[in-house]
């Protein structure tokens, strides 16, 4: 009787720990057998998703705008400054951003599932482990910033751009360490559905960034060093504000102070972080490669200019997909951690339907205004014509790229990073790129052929992920989430100890 009482008390304690979790289901949803039941649960889950996705989208847009605004002001310094900042932002910082964000994404799995299971005390330990690993990674990646000039020259950039971008890269070294703090901290807060505070902090950072950049560049005329100072300061402000929020006690048991446990089981944590990084980088670099391949075509200037406009639009629409990716990753990891497999599966379904509808709406708007919008970006008639020709495939890309990140978010939430990394290699690099190069160069379809071929790789990857999810036993995933929480927390389940 005493043992049964202890078991009951342990279960009640875990339930109480989760009782205040925003929008976390108390119980798993029942099997849905009617249309009315589907509509009711769909409405409930939609509110939960947008509670997370709305602020996440807002945060992504604000942080994306920091770099975009810096590039705008660079154009007021000189043409070479604009080129240098653009190259540093897309090549040097872009490479590092993919690795750091990917490694930080390991926390989406671990913190999300631990939070759903009520193991709140482990979240702070996971956060500190990720800080340790990402700061070591930042130290290694800083070599890329230091030697950016010769590296850029070796891949075909002009001497002037390579030199200017190399100097600017050295100025931007603090940013990589800001990433090392920001990305784990963001995942830590996201897993607890504390998205609104991130949105507010990013908005304040953007509001400060714009006038401060103007003052430093226009009034003080600090040039490129001034751009670096302000951009670094903006990212440091975001980090400091998030840390103050966490250290002030607003996260409860999730943050109980610094612990030596952060240095335990680091190698296993590194493996999951690397798997997350590989999975994300393979996707980011895949789309960066389209611009690179277009640069070797005949009339490369026109092809690259037109493709850059399309990629710019695709990048802005991707902010919606990134927000939905964050939301579904949190929802799936939380519900699996709480042992709610049906709710996790239904959350995925709602996210896919919602993202697909958004993608169709945006695509239809582009197709309707295909004759008008290109002139907003460029005056060259040849570029405008090519952008119009590329608009149908841009519209299709928006739909696919709205769905694909949701599926990737499920993979992160469920802890499938390593498997998806192999899928990405096969679909993107073994199939997509060779097919795109075949269409673009061999069959002379140009930039349209390259894009179509590589988009086919994305379609294949989406189909494979969909098949994986359809074949998934969600009860097994919920059980694996419990095992993962115990393994990575270095602890044994209290309930199993009591039962044994």
UniProtKB/Swiss-Prot annotation:
Q: Does the keyword Iron-sulfur apply?
A: no
Cited CDD domains: MATE_eukaryotic (cd13132)
Q: Name one Pfam family in it.
A: MatE
What UniProt keywords are attached to this protein's entry? Membrane, Transmembrane, Transmembrane helix, Transport, Vacuole
Where does the chain cross the membrane? Answer: 67-87, 91-111, 132-152, 161-181, 197-217, 227-247, 277-297, 302-322, 349-369, 393-413, 419-439, 449-469
Q: Name one GO biological process term.
A: xenobiotic detoxification by transmembrane export across the plasma membrane
Q: Where in the cell is it found?
A: Vacuole membrane
- For whether the record's keyword set contains Amino-acid biosynthesis, the answer is no
Bilayer disposition of the protein: Multi-pass membrane protein
Instruction: List cellular component terms (GO).
Output: plant-type vacuole; vacuolar membrane; vacuole
Which terms in the Gene Ontology molecular function aspect does this entry carry? Answer: antiporter activity; xenobiotic transmembrane transporter activity
Please give the family membership noted in the entry: Belongs to the multi antimicrobial extrusion (MATE) (TC 2.A.66.1) family.
Protein name (record) = Protein DETOXIFICATION 29
Gene behind this protein: DTX29
């Amino acid at each position: 009787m005493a043992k049964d009482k202890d078991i009951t008390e342990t279960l009640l304690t875990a339930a109480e720990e989760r009782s205040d979790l925003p929008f976390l289901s108390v119980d798993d949803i029942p099997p849905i057998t009617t249309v009315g039941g589907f509509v009711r649960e769909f409405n409930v889950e939609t509110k939960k998703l947008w509670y997370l996705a709305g602020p996440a989208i807002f945060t992504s847009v604000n942080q994306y705008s920091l770099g975009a605004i810096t590039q705008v002001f660079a154009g007021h310094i000189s043409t070479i400054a604009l080129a240098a900042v653009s190259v540093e932002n897309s090549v040097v910082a872009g490479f590092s951003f993919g690795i750091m964000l990917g490694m930080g994404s390991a926390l989406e799995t671990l913190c999300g599932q631990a939070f759903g299971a009520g193991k709140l005390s482990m979240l702070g330990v996971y956060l500190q482990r990720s800080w340790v690993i990402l700061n070591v990674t930042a130290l290694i990646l800083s070599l890329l910033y230091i030697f950016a000039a010769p590296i850029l020259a070796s891949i075909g950039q002009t001497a002037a751009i390579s030199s200017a971008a190399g100097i600017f890269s050295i100025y931007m070294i603090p940013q990589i360490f800001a990433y090392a703090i920001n990305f784990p901290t963001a995942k830590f807060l996201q897993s607890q559905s504390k998205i609104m505070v991130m949105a507010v902090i990013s908005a304040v950072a953007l509001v400060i960034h714009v006038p401060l950049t103007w003052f430093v560049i226009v009034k003080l005329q600090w040039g490129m060093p001034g751009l670096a100072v302000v951009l670094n300061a903006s990212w440091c402000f975001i980090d400091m504000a998030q840390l103050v929020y966490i250290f002030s006690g607003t996260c409860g048991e999730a943050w109980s102070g610094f612990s030596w446990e952060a240095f335990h089981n680091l190698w296993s944590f590194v493996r999951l972080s690397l798997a997350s990084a590989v999975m994300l980088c393979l996707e980011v670099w895949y789309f960066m490669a389209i611009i690179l391949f277009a640069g070797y075509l005949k009339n490369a200037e026109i092809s690259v200019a037109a493709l850059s406009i399309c990629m710019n639009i695709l990048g802005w629409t991707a902010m919606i997909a990134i927000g939905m990716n964050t939301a579904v990753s949190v929802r799936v990891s939380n519900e699996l951690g709480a042992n709610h497999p049906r709710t996790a599966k239904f959350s995925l379904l709602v996210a896919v339907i919602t993202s697909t509808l958004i993608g169709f709406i945006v695509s239809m708007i582009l197709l309707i205004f295909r004759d008008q919008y290109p002139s907003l970006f460029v005056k060259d008639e040849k570029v405008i014509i090519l952008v119009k020709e590329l608009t149908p495939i841009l519209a299709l890309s928006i739909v696919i790229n709205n769905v694909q990140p949701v599926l990737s978010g499920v993979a992160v939430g469920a802890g499938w990073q390593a498997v998806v990394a192999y899928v990405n290699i096969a679909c993107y690099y073994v199939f997509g790129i060779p097919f795109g190069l075949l269409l673009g160069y061999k069959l002379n379809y140009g930039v349209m052929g390259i894009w179509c071929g590589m988009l086919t790789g994305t379609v294949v990857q989406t189909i494979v992920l969909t098949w994986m999810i359809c074949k998934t036993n969600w009860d097994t995933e919920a059980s694996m989430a419990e095992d993962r929480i115990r393994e990575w927390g270095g602890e044994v389940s209290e309930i199993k100890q009591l039962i044994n």
